[in-house]
Design a protein with these regions (language model features):
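Buried hydrophobic packing segments
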Residues: 11-15, 41, 112, 116
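Short glycine-rich or small-residue beta-strand-to-loop segments that form or flank ligand, phosphate
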Residues: 18, 59-61, 97-102
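Conserved PLP-binding catalytic core of the aspartate aminotransferase-like
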Residues: 47-79
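A common structural junction motif
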Residues: 78-84, 117-120
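A short beta-turn/loop motif at secondary-structure boundaries
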Residues: 52-54, 89-92
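PLP-dependent enzyme catalytic core of the Aspartate aminotransferase-like
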Residues: 90, 94-145
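A short linear hydrophobic-aromatic micro-motif
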Residues: 45-49, 82-87
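Structural signature of PLP-dependent enzymes
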Residues: 1-35
Length: 145
């Protein structure tokens, strides 16, 4: 069979990018994104699914309370073209997940926080002040670390 040469080239480029950034810097970036995302979520009065001691540097799972997470995800996809992962099995409709593993930069985190904030604002779930505070919190963590 013929191997997927494009995937081999993509892997090679990904490994070059990782070598350039350095593993320690990659780990620090993922930790920074975890902190920015989780603290922005708290500023929006949403609840993290995991206990803070066990938050993942790869993904942030967010409980939506009375908001239907599937409808929330759909709104963000339609309005901002951002794909958020949903909950599975008994968590479907109750949580959504924001991935921040791999090639994710600060602008991506700011964009997702902004989209979540704007959607909550449009639904009357938060105030403009809270939306601004969430963005400020995310930016503070991204700049400080």
């Amino acid at each position: 069979y013929t191997p997927a040469v494009n995937l081999v080239f993509a892997l090679d480029e990904s490994l070059k990018m990782m070598r350039e950034e350095g593993l320690e810097n990659i780990f620090l970036r993922h930790e920074k994104h975890k902190l920015a995302m989780s603290n922005a979520v708290k500023a929006l009065n949403l609840k993290l699914f995991a206990d803070e001691r066990y938050l993942s540097p790869a993904v942030t799972a967010i409980q939506t309370g009375e908001i239907d997470a599937e409808e929330f995800r759909k709104t963000i996809k339609n309005k901002f073209d951002i794909l958020l992962a949903g909950g599975q099995d008994h968590l479907k409709g109750k949580i959504f997940r924001v991935g921040h593993l791999g090639y994710v930069n600060n602008r991506d985190i700011i964009t997702v926080v902004s989209a979540i904030s704007k959607t909550l604002l449009d639904q009357g779930k938060i105030t403009t002040k809270q939306a601004g505070e969430a963005l400020e919190v995310a930016c503070t963590y991204l700049e400080a670390n």
